[in-house]
Amino acid sequence: MTNEINHANPAALHSVPYHVGIIMDGNGRWAQARGRPRLAGHQAGVDNIRRILEASVRYGIKVLTIYAFSTENWQRPMDEVMGLMQLLSLTIKRQLNELHKNGVQIRHSGRMAGINPDLQAQIRHALEVTQHNDRIILNVAFNYGGRAEILDAVRQVIADGIPPDSLTEELFSRYLYTCDLPDADLIIRTGGEWRLSNFLIWQAAYAEYYTTPTYWPDFDEEELYKALLEYNARERRFGRVLQQT
Ligand code: FPP
C-alpha cells in the first residue's frame, strides 16, 4: 500500500507551492478523442477549473494562475476564438456569485485592449466584486503573453520616468500584470508538451516544471496531488549550492 496516493491527506506534503501556474493544454484532443467539436473540450476544460480550484484550496495553494487565452490564440479559427470569449463571459455570469461566496479573489493578467468592451466590463466587475476575498487568488491569464507583459511593463517604466539606476528586479516585478503576486513556484502543463509557450516567463524563472500527458479536462485532484508530490521531491536551489554537512 506504500505507493497508494492518499489525496485525502494534504498533510503528507511537507511543502506546498504558494503560487501554481497551469497551462491547460489538451482540450481539443480530449474532444477529438470523443468525436466532439473542439469547443466541447474547452467547455469540459472550464468545468475542470472548478474542480482543481477546490482541490487547490484543500491543499493550501494560495495563488492559481491559469492560462486561458494567449495573445497567440487569436490566430485560431474565428469560431473557436469567439467560442472561447463566450465561454469566459458565460462562466463569469454563471459562477461569479458562487466564487465570491467561496472567498475566491479573481485577478486578470493580460491586455484588456483587444477584448470586446462588454467582456471587458464583465471582467472588471468580477475583479471589483471579489477584490477583498482571501481564500485563494484565481489569476486568469486571458489575452496574455509573457513577452507582451514585459513589453507593457517596460513602456510603463519609461512613461513613469524611472531612472535606470533605480530599476531593480523587485520594482520591475511590480509593473507586471501580476504586480504584487509572488513568483510562480510550480508550473504544471497538461497535454504532454514540454514548452512554456510564453507563459509567466518572468515569474517562472525559478519555478519547478511538471508536465503530464493527461489532457486538461481529465486532470483531477489525484493528478494534482501527483504534481505536488513531485514538487516535494525537487530540491530548489535558486542558483545556489546547498550547504554541505
Ligand atoms: C489548450 O487546449 C487550451 C486553451 C486554448 C485554453 C484553455 C481554455 C480553457 C480551459 C477554456 C477557457 C477558459 C476560460 C476561463 C473561459 P488546446 O485547444 O490547445 O488543445 P489541443 O492541444 O489538444 O488542441
Predicted regions located by residue number:
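Flexible, compositionally biased loop and terminal segments
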Residues: 1-245
